[in-house]
A protein has these predicted regions:
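An anion/pyrophosphate-binding glycine-rich loop and adjacent beta-alpha core
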Residues: 1-20, 24, 92-98, 137
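A generic local structural motif
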Residues: 5, 31, 45-47
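A generic short-segment signal for beta-strand/edge and adjacent turn/coil regions
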Residues: 9-15, 26-30, 181-182, 194-199
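Long, contiguous hydrophobic alpha-helical segments, chiefly transmembrane helices and signal peptides
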Residues: 14, 18, 31-33, 79, ...
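Short loop/turn motifs at secondary-structure junctions and domain boundaries
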Residues: 24, 29, 34-38
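Glycine- and aromatic-enriched mobile tails/lids
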Residues: 39-41, 45-60, 64-269
Length: 269
């Protein structure tokens, strides 16, 4: 066990957090560690050169995008990613803004947004927060660390049932604010994201990086593809796109990394 000075130096925030929230001194007592959803390695498909999304005027960068990490993001890489691609997205967005003429608001888009808000605001029989918790539990139980087709399919059934409850949520904004409404929108988006994640996990019949299948334990060359989910007639459809060949420059960088034989003293994830 490491000394208290070592722990405070290397893990100051964690040391303080456990002390403040659980009254556990991790320099003296063991702490319970469990897997948790930490990072989204999938996301919106963007043009890698300018980070456009296919929607005019909308740019995306960072964790919201598909990213460059593949199936296993290494610690610290997300900071390098946002520095490079955040600048790229911001520069292209700024250049586009400079050249814009007057932009008129779409009354149709505004009316659609109002209709969407009004559809949520009503007295309902289901409170939003417990449904949020139900969704988290579904993803933990059916799309967690180790997955299988049987459990993933059962998860989809539960998500479809949860989705059917969305029209029945109770949303009543008051003088205190619009928290109910925000959570309702968050739940709807989370259900869509969860459904997309599970459907893609069903299609990827292999184990690769953070995606582990008990019924397909090995990496499969046939699965060297990216899975894309999109809405067609209000239904999610999953497509596969072959991965593009890396440039010679990137191939060399990866090959040079593979030549590292001694990992002593290095943090490995």
């Amino acid at each position: 066990h490491k000394s208290k000075d070592f722990i405070i130096e290397k893990l100051p925030r964690m040391y303080r957090q456990f002390l403040d929230t659980l009254m556990i001194d991790i320099s003296k007592s063991p702490m319970e560690v469990a897997p948790t959803a930490h990072y989204s390695m999938g996301g919106i498909k963007v043009d890698p050169d300018n980070h456009t999304t296919g929607i005019q005027g909308l740019y995306a960068a960072g964790e919201v995008t598909g990213g460059l990490h593949g199936a296993n993001r290494l610690g610290g890489n997300s900071l390098a990613e946002i520095l490079v691609f955040g600048k790229r997205a911001g520069s292209h967005a700024a250049n586009r803004s400079i050249n814009l003429d007057i932009q008129y608001r779409s009354k149709k888009a505004i009316d659609n947004a109002h209709d969407k808000i009004n559809s949520f605001i009503k007295n309902g029989k289901n409170v939003v927060r417990p449904l949020q918790r139900d969704l988290r539990n579904i993803m933990w139980e059916h799309c967690g660390v180790v997955r299988s087709e049987k459990r993933l399919n059962a998860g989809i059934d539960k998500i479809n049932n949860l989705k059917s409850l969305l029209p029945t949520v109770d949303v009543r904004p008051d003088s205190e604010g619009f928290e109910d409404l925000m959570i309702a929108f968050d739940l709807e988006a989370s259900i869509l994201s969860a459904e997309s994640t599970i459907l893609s996990a069903i299609e990827r019949k292999e184990s690769r990086g953070a995606h582990q299948r008990s019924d397909f334990e090995n990496i499969e060359e046939s699965q060297n593809v990216n899975y894309l989910s999109k809405l067609e007639d209000e239904k999610l459809v999953i497509e596969s796109n072959p991965t593009e060949k890396l440039s010679d420059e990137l191939e060399k960088a990866i090959d040079d990394t593979k030549e590292i034989k001694n990992y002593s003293g290095k943090l490995i994830e």
